[in-house]
C-alpha cells in the first residue's frame, strides 16, 4: 500500500489567511495522513478559533483529532492530525518534560493493509538532554510496534540526536537534508519502521508558517 504522509508545524496560525493557506497546501499535496504541531484551540492569539477544525473545514478529511499538551492563554495548545482512515484507537503519552509538557500521540488506523500505528509528537527546544530523555521514552513505545509511522517537530540540533531510536528510516537525514525550519534547521521529520519503504521526499515551502511542510511517499 502506498501512502503520502506529511508533517507540518503550523506555528499557531495567524488568522484566516494562514488557515486558508495551510489548508490549500495540504489539499494540493493530496495527503493520506498529516501530523500537525503547534495547534491552538480557543486561544486568544488565534482569535479563540479551533484551528484544527478550521483547517479541516477546507480540507474535508473524514477524521481529525487534537491532543492537548498544555493549557494556554484561555484555551488549549497541542498537536493534531488529519487522516482519511477510520480511527480504531487513540492514546496520549506524557513525555518527560522539564519546562513545557510535551506529548506523543498514538493513533491506530484501519487501512487497506490492516491496522497501522501512526504517531505524532513535538519535542522540547530547551536542551539536547531533555530531548534525549524524550526520545528514550519514545523508543520504549516504538519497540512494541511491528510497523509504524512517526511525524513530528523534533527540535534537534543535529541528526545524531535521533540515533537514540533504532531500526528506523528517516525522510530528513544527513544524506538528504531538508531545511524545514526557515530560520535554519532540519528539525521536522517523518520516521518509519525499517520494514516501510520511503520512496520520495518533498519539501513544500510555505509562506504561512515559520516551518516548511515535509512530505514523504511511502510503501507500507
List PLM regions with ranges.
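N-terminal, active-site-proximal structural segment of metallo-dependent hydrolase catalytic domains
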Residues: 1-58, 71-79, 136, 220
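Active-site metal-binding loops of divalent metal-dependent hydrolases
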Residues: 8-10, 39, 121-123, 152-154, ...
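Metal-dependent phosphoester-hydrolase catalytic domains
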Residues: 92-93, 108-111, 143-149, 154-220
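Short, Asp-centered acidic motifs that coordinate Mg2+ and/or phosphate
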Residues: 3, 32-33, 116, 147-149, ...
Amino acid at each position: 500500500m502506498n501512502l503520502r504522509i506529511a508533517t507540518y508545524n503550523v506555528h499557531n496560525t495567524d488568522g484566516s489567511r494562514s488557515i486558508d493557506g495551510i489548508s490549500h497546501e495540504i489539499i494540493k499535496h493530496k495527503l493520506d495522513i498529516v501530523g500537525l504541531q503547534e495547534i491552538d484551540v480557543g486561544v486568544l492569539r488565534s482569535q479563540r478559533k479551533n484551528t484544527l477544525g478550521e483547517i479541516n473545514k477546507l480540507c474535508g478529511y473524514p477524521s481529525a483529532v487534537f491532543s492537548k499538551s498544555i493549557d494556554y492563554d484561555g484555551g488549549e495548545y497541542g498537536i493534531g492530525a488529519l487522516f482519511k482512515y477510520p480511527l480504531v484507537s487513540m492514546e496520549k503519552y506524557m513525555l518527560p518534560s522539564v519546562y513545557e509538557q510535551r506529548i506523543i500521540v498514538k493513533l491506530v488506523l484501519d487501512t487497506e493493509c490492516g491496522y497501522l500505528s501512526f504517531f505524532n509528537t513535538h519535542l522540547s527546544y530547551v536542551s539536547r538532554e531533555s530531548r534525549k530523555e524524550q526520545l528514550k521514552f519514545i523508543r520504549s513505545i516504538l519497540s512494541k510496534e511491528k510497523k509504524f509511522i512517526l511525524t513530528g517537530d523534533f527540535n534537534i540540533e543535529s541528526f545524531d540526536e535521533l540515533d537514540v531510536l533504532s531500526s528506523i528510516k528517516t525522510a530528513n537525514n544527513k544524506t538528504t537534508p531538508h531545511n524545514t525550519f526557515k530560520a535554519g534547521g532540519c528539525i521536522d521529520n517523518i520516521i518509519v519502521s525499517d520494514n516501510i519503504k520511503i520512496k520520495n521526499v518533498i519539501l513544500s515551502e510555505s509562506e504561512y508558517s515559520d516551518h516548511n511542510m515535509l512530505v514523504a511517499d511511502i510503501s507500507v
